[in-house]
Amino acid sequence: MTLNGKELAAVLKAGHAMVQADGKVEESELKVLFGELANFGVPAEQAQLMMVAADAMEASEMFETLTNLSTEAKKYVAGYLAAIMISDNDIDDSEVNMWKLICTLSKFPTMNLNEALTFWRNN
C-alpha cells in the first residue's frame, strides 16, 4: 500500500491520538506507532519530522484526508489504530471510543476490532 506524505501525516496524527487516548503513553504503543512508518519507507531519522508534520495538521484536515483514502487503505488504517490500542495489553474504554470516533468521522468501513486487526496483519 502506498500513501503520500499528507496521507501518512494524517494516519500518524490519528495514531498519535490513539496513543494518548487513555492518558498513558506506553513504549509498546510508540513502537507500533513509529514501526509503521518504517513499513512505509520512512527512515528512522525522519520519523520525528513526520511527527511534527502530523501534529501541525488540523483535526479537520486529518479527517478529510482519511475520508478520501481508498476503502482498502481505510481498512488498513483501522487495523493499525487497533494494533496501537492493543499493544499494551490493556484496552481502555477511552481507547475504544477514540477508535470508533476516528473510524466513524473518517467514514471507514464498518468493522470490529478483530476484523480490523486481521486485515492489517494480512496486508
Across the structure, where does each feature detected by a protein language model lie?
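Small-residue-enriched hydrophobic alpha-helices in membranes
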Residues: M1-N123
